[in-house]
């Protein structure tokens, strides 16, 4: 009886952890909203005069920094704890965007602030909701991982629409410290990102030692079911062919999706205007929002599906479906 109480009694409702995870990921998804700024930054008659390749470099720097920092963040997490790591990530992300707003039309300033500093913040914060979530929900790992990272996709919808159209669009209406549109939005977003991550971090705590959800029994790794787990050290993992196969699947799938995220605004405007469509900017803005919405929905859906059919089959189906859709998209835009 005592053991049962120890396993099921928790200091907080575990669903609050999910809420906190979503708040954090809503902010970290800012990188996916970068495309909403590219048209303004590259407008020849505008304030900034960035080239398309310069905006691509800022976006790429953010993604690369995010990916690299995650490796180190995973190692830091057991040492400093989830709350401290999330707070550090949120403050760095917010600082990067605020400084990006203050550096103005400097490409190198944007590269450093939005790309490097902001990307570092995303990398530090991203690992926390996932790691904490699966500890609280060992019975629903796929679903909870999907929910935890869905905010990353949904967040882009919010930031894209706030900047571009909701309430007249912050890019058109905002002025902070007399700064022009893009810079003002960076400052507003930076403060907002930091506050949201700080709020979410308050519930980023690990469950008690030995915690198990009520009525759940850990699967037996020797049973051959997909829920079983085998632990590897980093060195052991790097010696397995499965690691390199899985890494290859992720990198090629991510490259395809991220290329779409970066160029959907500019490419969409060019393609629509080529076909004589006048309101191309509004249409591509809506397309960006729908892309982000289904990005979030897909994370939840595939996470839940993987709990039912297994991780291997789920990722195989995802990659195959993505390939078919990318080929269909190519056909749509060349006809």
Map each language-model feature to its residues.
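Extracytoplasmic gate region of multi-pass secondary transporters
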Residues: 34-41, 144, 160-163, 233-304
